Amino acid sequence: MGTKRKTHKNANLKHLYAKIRGGHVTRYHTRPELTNGQNVAAHTWRAMVILHTLWPEASKNCLLHMMYHDVAEIAVGDLPATTKWNYSEVHSILKRIENDFENSIGIGELFIPITVEEAKACDAADKLELVLHCYELITQGNKSATDVMNRGIKYLKEKYPHEKQVNRALKMIIRLYTMNK
């Protein structure tokens, strides 16, 4: 009885440690001029604030999904989005590895199911955080963030043309950007 309980407790601690370590992954490692010290933990917190602000009715599972959405990068790394876009077979394999890792620590889709609409809200919040991060870099004089910000805006406009929350946020960001140019 004691051994079984200790094994379960150790597994929980390993899962906890894996989840926490995921927050330490540095973002934009292939574009160091964009990092500005941002790691997965900072990005995730900001994305969760965006999600909760724009979609205040977001379910607990939706918020949990957002909280853990990049944790698997501790196991597989942060592959650049452009690589995923240009090599769908690599993206497919990476997604499978990420899902396996997430499920192994109790945070994958099997444990935290979300609806299609919630997945869209999480994706939009994730990309809006990217756009805001780049906007902040630009306002600090880092013009090298402009291309990434513009790609993020284009992605959001094309993928979510009828999503009111996304369009309102983009209008605000674009207005601020053009005012500060």
Residue ranges of model-derived segments:
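Active-site helical microenvironments for divalent-metal-assisted chemistry
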Residues: 2-181
